[in-house]
Amino acid sequence: MAIGLIGRKVGMTRIFAEDGVSIPVTVIEIASNRVTQVKTLETDGYRALQVTTGTKKANRITKPEAGHFAKAGVEAGRGLWEVRLADGEGESIEVGAELNVDIFADVAKVDVTGQSKGKGFQGGIKRWNFHAQDMTHGNSLAHRSNGSIGQNQTPGRVFKGKKMSGHMGAERVTTQNLDVVRVDAERNLLLVKGAVPGATNGNLIIKPAVKA
C-alpha cells in the first residue's frame, strides 16, 4: 500500500543493531489518521484521501471546521492533509476509517516531507554555500558579500531567480529513501534511519519511497 500518513517528529536517538553498530534514528509518532473525506474522479476530478490526526481544543475550531468534522463523524484534529491515491488504490477506505502506523510494517524505505527549520534572513554564504572572499590581501569591505550579480549594459539588469541574500528555511522539504528501522504499532511509533526535515513536534508526511 502506497498511502501516506501524517506524523509528528518526536526527536532523534540511536539504537544498536545485533552486531553492535550504532544506528542514528528519528522517532516519528504516527497516531491514528482519521479519514474525513474521500475525493473521487467523479466529484473532484482526482482521487485522494483527506485525513486528520491528533486533537484540537473545541474553542480553537471554526464553525466550518466543526461542521466538516461532524459530517465525517470523526474527532476534530490538529489539521487537515490530503494524500493522493493511485488507480485502484484505497478503494475500500471509507469516511471515518482509521489508518495506523502498521501499514508500514512491510515497507523498507520511506520519503518524509516536512517544513524545514526557519533560519531568518541570511547571506549568500550561509544560504547558498557561496565561497567567502579573502580576509586580507587588500580586501577590507567585501569578505562575505555575494560578489558580482550581473553583467554590464547588456542585459543591464539582474536575472530573476539570482541566488542572493534573503529568507532561509521554513519551506517544504522532502528527504527521500530513509530506511525503516522499526515499526512499533503498540506505541504508534515509526523509527527511520537518519534525520528528517523540521523541528521537534513538527508535522510530517510519511510515504513509501517512490525511488526505492
From Swiss-Prot:
Annotated GO MF terms: rRNA binding; structural constituent of ribosome
Keyword Ribonucleoprotein found: yes
Post-translational changes noted in the entry: Methylated by PrmB.
Superkingdom of the organism of origin: Bacteria
InterPro entries documented for this protein: Ribosomal_uL3, Ribosomal_uL3_bac/org-type, Ribosomal_uL3_CS, Transl_B-barrel_sf
Modified residues (N5-methylglutamine): 153
TM spans (from-to): none
GO biological process: translation
GO cellular component, one term: cytosolic large ribosomal subunit
Keyword annotations of the record: Methylation, Ribonucleoprotein, Ribosomal protein, RNA-binding, rRNA-binding
HAMAP family named in the record: Ribosomal_uL3_B (MF_01325_B)
Functional note: One of the primary rRNA binding proteins, it binds directly near the 3'-end of the 23S rRNA, where it nucleates assembly of the 50S subunit.
Subunit structure and binding partners: Part of the 50S ribosomal subunit. Forms a cluster with proteins L14 and L19.
Family the entry assigns: Belongs to the universal ribosomal protein uL3 family.
Name of the protein in question: Large ribosomal subunit protein uL3
Species in which this protein is naturally found: Shewanella sediminis (strain HAW-EB3)
Annotated gene: rplC
